[in-house]
Amino acid sequence: GLRDAGNIYGRLTNSTQDVFERRVAALEGGVAGLAVASGAAAVTYSLQNILGVGDHVVAADNLYGGSFNLITHTLASQGVSYTIVNVNDLKLLEAAIRPNTKAIYAETFGNPNSDVTNIDAVAEVAHRHNIPLIIDNTFGTPYLIRPIEHGADIVIHSATKFIGGHGSSLGGVIVDGGKFDWKKDAEKFHTLAKPDPSYHGAVFADVAGQAAFVTRIRAVILRDTGRICAFEYTCMDGEAGNFIPASRTACRKCFESG
C-alpha cells in the first residue's frame, strides 16, 4: 500500500492535503511533502522519526524557543541526549558530534534574531559523519532560499507564518530532500532501513525509496497521532464556513470533557 501514493486512510492524507504537500515540496525542490497540524508538530515528528532512547542530536544555539525546549526537555526526558552549539563555528560543531549523533538541527534564519546559518558548511560536516541535516526554513521560505539545494536533507516549516500568509490557520510541513542514504548505516537509522514490526515488517527505505523519511512519519507516527491533529485543526480553522455543525458539536463536547 505504500508503493503507490493515494488516500489510503483519512488520518494520513486527503486530496486537499495532497495538493498542498506537492506544491510545497516542489517549491523546496524536495521529492515529497507531509502536512501536519502545526510547525511544532513538524519539528517533533521529524526528530522522533529517527531519534530514540540513547541517541544524540546536535542543535543550533539560536533556535525558536519551542524547538529548544522540545530538544532540551521533552526529548531529553525520553532518553535523547543533546548538545547545543553555534553551528556556524565548524570546529565546535565537529567536536559536538558523537558516534550516536543521528541529526543536526538548525534554522535557516534563527527565530527571532534572524541570524543566518551557513547551510552549505554545516551540511558538509554533517554528511562527512553520515548524519542528516534538518533545517527549519520557516523564516526563509523557498522564495528566498531552498535549503535542499545547499545540502539540507529535511526541510520543515511552520505554515502558520509566511506560507499561510496571515496567521489565520495552523499548519506545518515536512519536506523530504530524498538524497540521504538511510541504508548506508542501517543499524544507526534502523527506523527507516530495518524492518518495522509495527508496519508489517516494511523497510521504508525500500518501499518508499527517496521519500522514506516522510513516508514513515505518515504511515507510523500519523497512524498514532493523526486523528488528534486533524481534530484540533478542524476546531481551530473556522474560516469560510469550515465550522460545520458536526465539527462544532464535536469540538464543544471535547472541550467540555477536558
Model-identified regions with their sequence ranges:
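Conserved PLP-enzyme active-site core in the AAT-like
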Residues: 32-258
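Conserved N-terminal alpha-helix of the aminotransferase class I/II PLP-enzyme fold
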Residues: 1-44, 66-74
